Amino acid sequence: MEMNIKFPVIDLSKLNGEERDQTMALIDDACQNWGFFELVNHGLPYDLMDNIERMTKEHYKKHMEQKFKEMLRSKGLDTLETEVEDVDWESTFYLHHLPQSNLYDIPDMSNEYRLAMKDFGKRLEILAEELLDLLCENLGLEKGYLKKVFHGTTGPTFATKLSNYPPCPKPEMIKGLRAHTDAGGLILLFQDDKVSGLQLLKDGDWVDVPPLKHSIVINLGDQLEVITNGKYKSVMHRVMTQKEGNRMSIASFYNPGSDAEISPATSLVDKDSKYPSFVFDDYMKLYAGLKFQAKEPRFEAMKNAEAAADLNPVAVVETF
């Protein structure tokens, strides 16, 4: 079921004028009630975005499309007869930016494409950190608090998932990407403005995320829900397949470092913490097997692990 409801679109340029307070309130409301919002006038160069879109689509046609078709045949998905619930209808590859880049390890990327993605990644990293400080301001946290938590000892992790969702002859049989919440911190999505498909779960109904040209869609991951003690939410989202059109998706994940210690911010805890404390890498190990399930059991499992550690401290043997 889909709802006719106004998805939050936020003009970031208004932070510099008389509408700053109103814009900050819109961001806060979106984080509390949607877990998603769409940015316009975000400062990313439109010509850079256009070039990346062109090169991503060209790269898929030249280097990925045939591999995708072979994958369909190998999994028996080229003739869909029954509903498939354990595979996604997508073609993807990943670029890692932080702590170490793999940009020059990816085969078949032109030098122009590499340089554009390097530039785009750096600009998105800056935008992500600016957004984290805006969240701090709305939450009453010290500027830089979220960035510091994400840093760990070696800095945040930052990577980009480049996806194409090709036309599907029977979209009712398979999802482009199954419903899930994102495990990490802040996700910045540059999506196709002509082919839709991204939906989020809002009050029990699936809502389309509108494809707007040159916009950046923001969504919150599980770690921000934990750090804000549930004030801000990560939400379930999915990608629907389409009979026509190849949907491009470039999602960049600004996440905590692997050894970052995640816990609810003290100032956001009234009595008891609703969420566990843990090391980010431990959560990711759990998430790997439970991605397409509800987030609550993951939080509960981490809470149980935390309680077990408190009950069974490591013994210290003193020698004299």
Curated annotation (Swiss-Prot):
SUPFAM superfamilies in the record: Clavaminate synthase-like
Residues noted as binding Fe cation in the record, renumbered to the chain: H180, D182, H237
A biological process from GO: defense response
Annotated positions binding 2-oxoglutarate: R247
Organism field: Arabidopsis thaliana
Official protein name in the record: 1-aminocyclopropane-1-carboxylate oxidase 3
Effects seen without this gene: Reduced ethylene levels.
Gene Ontology cellular component list: cytosol
